[in-house]
Amino acid sequence: MSWNNIGVVEMTPILFQFLLSSLCVFLLFVFIRFLNDIWWTPIRLQRVFRQQGIRGPSYGFLYGNTKEILNMRKESMSRPMDYLSHNIFPRLQPHLYSWLNIYGKNFLNWYGPRAQFVVTQVDFVKETMIKDQAYPKMDPEWFAKKLLGDGIVTSKGKKWAKHRRLANHAFHAESLKSMTPAMIASVEMMLKRWKQHEGREIDVFQEFKILTSEVISRTAFGSSYLDGKDIFDRLTQLGIIITRNSYKVKLPGISLFYKSNDEIEAEKLDQGLYDSILRIMEKREKESTMSGEVGSFGTDFLGLLMKAMNDADEKNRITAQDVVDECKTFYVAGQETTTTLLAWVIFLLGIHTDWQEKARQEVLNLFGQEIPNSDGLAKLKTVNMIINETLRLYPPVIFLTRKVKEETKFGKLTLPANVHIVVPTLALHHDEQIWGDDALLFKPERFSQGVAKATNNNAAAFFPFGLGPRSCVGLNFATNEAKIALAMILQCYSFALSPTYIHSPVQILTVRPQHGLQVMLQPL
């Protein structure tokens, strides 16, 4: 045996001991880090907040308060509501409703080991939403990332600013005006279908899903509902998966070793969305080439995105993945927001037929039986009041989240870095201290002198489309579409809730009627 071989034999146990020691040190480090994240840090944060007078339910090891939340939600959602009641806050967010009553306007609760500072004090809300640098958007959960990618809703910093400029250009006043004919044509198609249901029951929620899909497909992507149907179906399935996994705590890094059925399904849906949107992009590129105007992709939202993707200036250029992410975002937002808004307006007018008649008279006085026009839409005061009151009672998004970037003063409080802030829109919209004893009643007249007067100039009292620099860029698009649809429906039909309707609001991305919205149509 050579001396070299003897050296190898003698070194092997030493090397083994070294590797074993290194592994033990690494595992000890991982364990300490894990313990710090799931126990020491939460307990420290809980103590910091309690010393400042902020209370809340105690932290539970690893799961935080998620088990309590899931149990409360299961109980609150187990039965339908009285259809005359709009008190949906304790139904949709029973944990927040309960803890606000116990701990006051601002409190701390736990989403797994993550601290969530819930704020409903209006000055705190305003500061959180307006100071985007101090309180940026949170990184989306894994499932939400599959739904929206890194688009305008989830991106931050320079990327968000670049994408926001593009969206502002796509949805400015003149662009919206040019979209009106496509919106009208889509509503006409819907009303043509409704002729088969005259004097009978119809589920208008399903009808509005088709309508809004058609409108966003035509106006933003130059296609049709049928062209985008696969995309809408996949997005709907992703939305259901997201809702199913709300408040489920997952250990960090576990997905590297194990994927749940929902995660596998979400990845398949995400890939399918990417492929479908890529085909729409390729089709637009071919149309541009065939027209002989290479680089001219149209003036709609997709056209502006593709123009930016091919921009000669690298500072303005975006990637193909960026285009896909923005398309997903606008397919979701363009359908969800207006669908639920229209559904709840019809629901409320189906109950309050006096307001239905007031709205109809306003529409007929302005347009008669003529097609609505942009100038007339701006004069729909009663319809606008009804829309605002609907958005107050049934806001599409019932909470917003932000993150504390670094330790900061928040009024008299000191907030540690990385604490999550939750702003429950629904709680503020239903707050009797803001809106009075009739906060849970449908009273559009409260908006008769505008939003500012109704809220006593308090911007943080009513923000169905967000507040501050991150507010929804599609606000005017959604309300314009809703006004056109409502005006044309009121010209043709009166309606009342069907006896088969079950009042069971549920949150699946947005607040919607769980079992559809059945109404009885009567032609005028």
From Swiss-Prot:
<dbReference type="InterPro" id="IPR001128">
    <property type="entry name" value="Cyt_P450"/>
</dbReference>
<keyword id="KW-0503">Monooxygenase</keyword>
<dbReference type="InterPro" id="IPR036396">
    <property type="entry name" value="Cyt_P450_sf"/>
</dbReference>
<keyword id="KW-0349">Heme</keyword>
<feature type="binding site" description="axial binding residue">
    <location>
        <position position="472"/>
    </location>
    <ligand>
        <name>heme</name>
    </ligand>
</feature>
<keyword id="KW-1133">Transmembrane helix</keyword>
<dbReference type="InterPro" id="IPR002401">
    <property type="entry name" value="Cyt_P450_E_grp-I"/>
</dbReference>
<protein>
    <recommendedName>
        <fullName>Cytochrome P450 CYP749A22</fullName>
        <ecNumber>1.14.-.-</ecNumber>
    </recommendedName>
</protein>
<dbReference type="Pfam" id="PF00067">
    <property type="entry name" value="p450"/>
</dbReference>
<comment type="similarity">
    <text>Belongs to the cytochrome P450 family.</text>
</comment>
<keyword id="KW-0472">Membrane</keyword>
<dbReference type="GO" id="GO:0020037">
    <property type="term" value="F:heme binding"/>
</dbReference>
<dbReference type="GO" id="GO:0004497">
    <property type="term" value="F:monooxygenase activity"/>
</dbReference>
<comment type="function">
    <text>Probable heme-thiolate monooxygenase.</text>
</comment>
<dbReference type="InterPro" id="IPR050665">
    <property type="entry name" value="Cytochrome_P450_Monooxygen"/>
</dbReference>
<keyword id="KW-0560">Oxidoreductase</keyword>
<dbReference type="GO" id="GO:0005506">
    <property type="term" value="F:iron ion binding"/>
</dbReference>
<keyword id="KW-0812">Transmembrane</keyword>
<dbReference type="GO" id="GO:0016020">
    <property type="term" value="C:membrane"/>
</dbReference>
<dbReference type="GO" id="GO:0016705">
    <property type="term" value="F:oxidoreductase activity, acting on paired donors, with incorporation or reduction of molecular oxygen"/>
</dbReference>
<keyword id="KW-0479">Metal-binding</keyword>
<feature type="transmembrane region" description="Helical">
    <location>
        <begin position="12"/>
        <end position="32"/>
    </location>
</feature>
<dbReference type="InterPro" id="IPR017972">
    <property type="entry name" value="Cyt_P450_CS"/>
</dbReference>
<keyword id="KW-0408">Iron</keyword>
